[in-house]
Amino acid sequence: MKHFLKPFFALFLLTNLISSCNSKKEPYTVKFTSEKDTLSYVLGAMNAKTISESRTESFEKLDKEQVIKGFNANLAGTPAEACLSTLQQLFGPTYQDFNPSYLKEGSLCMGKLTGYAFYYDIRKLGALDRVNFTMVKKGFEDGLYRRDSTVIKPNSMRFIMSEFITGLNVDNGNKMLEKAKKIPGVQVFDNGIVLQTLQAGKGPNPGATDDVKVHYILTSALGDTIQSSYRGDQNGKVEPIPLSLNGGVIPGWSFAIPKMKVGGKYRIYVPWNLAYGEQQGKESLCFFVELIERGAAGSFTNPIKTNQQ
């Protein structure tokens, strides 16, 4: 993780050097001395876009210097709940209006809330030591004034962000898996899956190609709930989810579910390569699973067959 940006960072510096030598007009530049600087600048600029791209008309009216002041002042993570009512005064109860009498105070609060959210997220991800807050401030300012794209091209920014998030996902996933291995009584398999029995089932084990009905709660490596079948459908109806173990679930489930017994409750810790892989940023995941029922392939997931004449 430490050197995940090195090849790109070297290319970025070389490109900037060549372009500055070939241009007659001195371009707007920012000096980066490390990968940490580059990443921090990008993080700041991307956070500015959460303001500049969310409410285009209102954004143009904001006092940008006050937004920057609020953001910089609140990067220590000071809660700013009082600012919520101020923003309602600025934008109205439905956030469709704009009251210029609250311009200065509201702009300051916009920055404070953005700064707090940024600090909170970075701290939760365990990445405070990977960020140079001085460069975050610079990136935020440039992003707010829309000059960040002259420093780093948008595609390059997206690449840097993707690599950063993926690296954090891998690190946090590994921490989750290592912690899970130390839980008394868990089963640890060679492929990295950790299976914890919370309540032993008394029914049969599903076969490798069976259908099953389950309830489940999916959480991230940091413990955030992503999905839950217990929440029910759009009508509030809570029913077990029918799934096919033969291609209808992630590889981690195809491996772990047959090791469960109907009626049991389990927790599966799944490495990223047996979850959704690279397409979901190499996230390792945790599933609480209540195995309700099993049936032969096609019992729960195939369409109802009509009688042939």
Ranges and model annotations:
Residues C21-Q309:
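Cross-family detector of peptidyl-prolyl cis-trans isomerase
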